[in-house]
Amino acid sequence: MLRKGAEEILILSRAFRYIKKTDISSVYLSKIGKGSVIMYSSVNTIWVLFGAALVFFMQAGFAMVETGFTRAKNAGNIIMKNLMDFCIGTPVFWLVGFGIMFGAGNGFFGKIGGIASEANYGTAMLPDGVPFWAFLIFQTVFCATAATIVSGAMAERTKFLSYCIYSLIISLVIYPVSGHWIWGGGFISQMGFHDFAGS
């Protein structure tokens, strides 16, 4: 039974090697038809939004884990800190962080071009078939979760206001700058680095 499962995994891994990223051009459209491209786009969008929902639920998971590791009197504080990560991180990332992460700039820091929108930043960073708003939601929940990960180490060690300032800094500077290096065309991506899992 174990051997059969290992063989199936090996077959799947070999099959995925041959899947290539296809260009949606006029030749491609004439071969498969417009309906297939719409389906391709819909599946990619659903997949990105499903991934965003899973990452969003990580917020609740981290809140539960951290609450379990702390004393009962600090449970409300921990849950509020995890909620504030998303409440602070979302507007900060939409107003400034997205521009730092995906704006045209140098290899270290993107240029802020206004609030996160397709009109301000274009579509060059988008995966094939994924609309801007779905990509923005995906990146936003990752930004908030990045701030939440560290909150477990700060549980029962910081005051609430200090933690809110920390969350602001993570969402405004640390996550967008390090994200620009890899996903925004920064110096690490220019060296040929590819990050497939978001780590």
Residue ranges and their predicted role:
Residues 29-199:
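Hydrophobic alpha-helical transmembrane bundles of multi-pass membrane proteins
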Residues 2-38:
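Short, Lys/Arg-enriched N-terminal segments with co-localized hydrophobic residues
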